[in-house]
Structures are given as structure tokens and as C-alpha cells.
């Protein structure tokens, strides 16, 4: 299967049908020397995402901002309040009580872009589903993995 086609199918499967239309045209794909699988995807030497062994995608904050052009992609995001914004930008986890809004497509273990006023400030891994995040007022909702302030 063509690498770009596989990447598009993966994006659509994880984040919703039609999200792959926002994949930049000029991308460079690197492959694992040992297995020959897709390893990293770059645009102008900026990392967009990494394909995980389990078939998932680890997206960067930069790529999440590109995909945010799609209204469907917003259902995979959550928005934090002003109080927690500086902590999230520094890599701290997002707690349920600081979530202002969350999309309905958030599942446990999924990559979740974290927004503040419609701008991606970080990307993390969901600890709870969207339904649980909305109902709970305590505990960690998302463990932050990548922020806009982090190098790379």
C-alpha cells in the first residue's frame, strides 16, 4: 500500500472521516531501517507525527493546529480554562475541573489536542473518556506529552 494513502486512512480512522484532506501536500516520510515501516512524517523539516507500533499516530502540536482547520477534528479536542493554561503549556497534566469543553470523540488512550481560545497549546494522551471528563470534577483527564514550548 502507498505510504501516503496509509497515512490518510490512519488519520481518517483515528480522528474522523475527511480529516486527511487537511494533510499538507509537501510531506516527507522516513522509514524504519529494520522493519521498513513508516516511522516519522515531516513538513519542511518540522515533525508532524510518528506512527506507533500499535497502529496509532502520535501527533505534534504543530500538526494538531493544521488539522484544526477541520470542524470534525475539533470533536477530538478539549479546551482548558485560563487558570490552567500556563501549567499545561509547561507540560503539566490537565485536570477534569479545568476542562471548559471537550469533544465527544475523546476515548481513553487517544491523542487529545488541548486548546485555549481555539489555539492548540499542547497534545496529550487521554486518561478518561469525554463522558467521564464531563461528569467528573476531580482527577487527571489528559497527560500532556507535547507542548508548543517544547523543543522540536
Tell me the role of every PLM-derived stretch.
Residues 1-3:
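Short, Lys/Arg-enriched, disordered terminal segments
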Residues 5-37, 43-101, 105-108, 112-152:
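Beta-strand/loop-dominated core regions that host nucleotide or nucleotide-derived cofactor-binding catalytic loops
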